[in-house]
């Protein structure tokens, strides 16, 4: 029911108006106290704006992927951590902003109950690192595996909270939670201001409780106990940042799983966490010739799914930007890093996490990095970000639009094996016409075609488009030369048939001018997209050997160029390769074959395309 207060309660309204005007002072007069709330005259410190959660976007450096002790054997050491801190300070000179340094997994002594640091990796403990961070205006953070025993042993105080298998602890039984929160407070008192919680287990219960309580009741009691403990921790330490990772809801293994999530996201976690993450970087189930673009699509897809689960974009940490030469990031180094950075910012999260080896970025790279930050930090802080288009994992064109009163920036992606046009809609009814736009960034190869509020993209291409103030050349970000998109693509008829176990084969006519692109997708016998997990480094299987694409002409093998030939800890459901036109005779038959190394029977789907670069 809508009503107008002056008409319903004129006397009360006039009285309230008089009180408000008295509190504000004479018309046009400045407030006598800049920290006072104008409507009440009550003193309200500026630092409390938005409390107890983040008031503005932040940038976090995380050293995971510079080292990797899970899918690789590169350890975290004090030397590595201090080196990356020096790199932060170097990048700052070029304008890059970092607010926090998150020390990720396994800094702790396995027998120290999160109170002591691992030796010999940290012979003198963390004091030098903490001091150097704080001396340079960077707030340090620490990673915890919450209530699971990941490379840590149960402290004496945790023993009466252990599960029967002794792999995790109950939050609502025994001494674990109290001791754990004391450890967090200990580190706060020693200068830590950001806390990352990973690998949580809400199914944990002591053997007696496991026998007498339902699993649902155990989950509820664990979540309630931990959430209340974090709430009290926040009240005591209002300047902390808390971030949630694995176990706090959502299904992050693939982009082809059912939705809504089987593991629902409890929105009450937003009462205590500044952000929830949406999955570590991995390939999506969308095949792409450029492996890194498929990873972009994964992060884009998961952010959309978490948004559809009613999380505000500001509270989702896509964790989509990692540099490094470790197994966790598939030895990416800096491949296609510019597009990954733009998309991380474009997704609208307020916790923007940069992982890995900062030394891989040159000073010139740093200046470009700072330019992207400057663009998006203003849009995130002063404006809004909204999603539009289709669902990334459904292979539909999509994007993220960010606006402020002066203009709009659209990050757009075409995940399909076809040239497609996408409309960039107005993001608000209050928004005026877009006017003339400008391409600010694009992948190499196919030249995006901008026409009014529409842009045409090549297969697997991303671009950035600015309108209003952001259509000026000063916002140009250039071309991503290490992602090359075909100038044209068209399907080539191919009838694939079975050719032995988990193998399909077809004979096609090699295009007269372009290359032949071969795309394979793997499904289980029930028709669902199926990932194969063959382990991480150093002992995992290279997926280029597991998913094999072969070709012959006149009985002789011809090379097939692939980019998925990596040891992929997170699994893969597809393969894409190209036969270059100068490696075969154009216009003549070529036999192509796709195979999977799965032991059980799978269904393989093959398609071929002519692509010209």
What is the predicted function of each stretch?
Residues 1, 19-29:
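Basic/polar N-terminal segments that are highly enriched at the extreme N-terminus
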Residues 1-9:
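Bacterial N-terminal signal peptides that target proteins for export
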Residues 8-22:
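Bacterial N-terminal signal peptides
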Residues 25-151, 328, 350-393, 402-408, ...:
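Conserved structural scaffold segments of CAZyme catalytic domains across common CAZy folds
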Residues 30, 62, 226-448, 452-465:
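Active-site-proximal substrate-binding groove within the catalytic cores of carbohydrate-active enzymes
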Residues 76-93, 174-188, 337-338:
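Short, acidic/polar
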Residues 97-319:
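Aromatic- and carboxylate-enriched substrate-binding clefts and catalytic-loop regions
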Residues 385-396, 405-407, 412-613:
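C-terminal beta-sandwich/jelly-roll accessory domains of carbohydrate-active enzymes
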